Amino acid sequence: AVFGCGDHNWASTYQYVPRFIDEQLAEKGATRFSARGEGDVSGDFEGQLDEWKKSMWADAIKAFGLELNENADKERSTLSLQFVRGLGESPLARSYEASHASIAENRELQSADSDRSTRHIEIALPPDVEYQEGDHLGVLPKNSQTNVSRILHRFGLKGTDQVTLSASGRSAGHLPLGRPVSLHDLLSYSVEVQEAATRAQIRELAAFTVCPPHRRELEELSAEGVYQEQILKKRISMLDLLEKYEACDMPFERFLELLRPLKPRYYSISSSPRVNPRLASITVGVVRGPAWSGHGEYRGVASNDLAERQAGDDVVMFIRTPESRFQLPEDPETPIIMVGPGTGVAPFRGFLQAREVLKREGKTLGEAHLYFGCRNDRDFIYRDELEQFEKDGIVTVHTAFSRKEGMPKTYVQHVMADQADTLISILDRGGRLYVCGDGSKMAPDVEAALQKAYQSVHGTGEQEAQNWLRHLQGTGMYTKDVWAGI
């Protein structure tokens, strides 16, 4: 039996490996006693896992004659906590083979009258860290002081308090075990504190709640349908519930144990090492807006943390090369098409820097087209650089404005549709196509526009166009670096 754990934000590879393993096991002669399940860590993962486990255990009982034992709702914590003096740090950096780097520059890309914030952040890399265009830079962020203070206040603790953690029976590898650490550092660097509460967390909160009416309310929140509407869609965290239900007497160590490890956030690198191998830049859209709960403001953990960093500040980071072959062609004469609205332009800035260096070295460049989209002139990030690249013959820039006064709403796929002959000609000549950005709406719309363009230019049907696009993907002529936020 196979259950796949994935993240739909990585749309192009979601559940690929679990499906492959399941198919290979069957082909090699293994007997599938229960259907494969799928879990999305950016969705109702726990609910999906619970449903799969119910059917899997029922199938296992039939296949192997097993018996199930129900666990008690109120589990005893496997963590023990002792207040001590001293200082420690999170071991998460080791698990990702991360390095300490420093911020070299942090500047705003949006115009002064824009209601958005996008930061251009340059990071001075350690001597042993290398990267190439198209790579991702992973950042281990710090939780906001506001959320850390909320936790400390709820449990009546001080950030300067020092503790030593020990654990038994359950994995706690993300926590700094066996050495002193301040509660402030522990909560800042080790755990996710503003994720939507899981059903398991809600059940535990209910088990520790001494007020019967409040306990019933919490139990009802984990019910099917109610959980999705009241918790998941509103991003209600375990901390939010603890503040609302003061009769919950959950010990701090149990609360800490139930929190998930702090996850790294990945950003497409927006620079080229051919310009400066010791500097890597990222382009960060700062996430701020009304909370889905209807109360207060929601702030993205990493984007707001990075937005506040200043030159000289430390950042814990690592480099990852995506498996999608999102790199420039080896032959600089190969024509390329780049589609990157908003912060999706990030990796293409690195591509264009590399092409500029190649041209300076005397290399002949194939034609390059960049399709960039934004709301209006105020959101046109890297405008001066892109216009200079175009003047220097590095790229042809095609811009789509979705909210420009006096102009119809236009997205990148609309501009591409108007240039069907040019696009299909480039791809027919062996050109490369790259798409970066939103994978839930933009990327599918771009693919639909490309298929219609192929049908129009070559006079084929819908199926032939679909096969053509699949062929481009299968041969690496079309690669994506996309995400699909909830």
Place the predicted regions along the sequence by residue:
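FNR-like FAD-binding dehydrogenase module
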Residues: 1-486
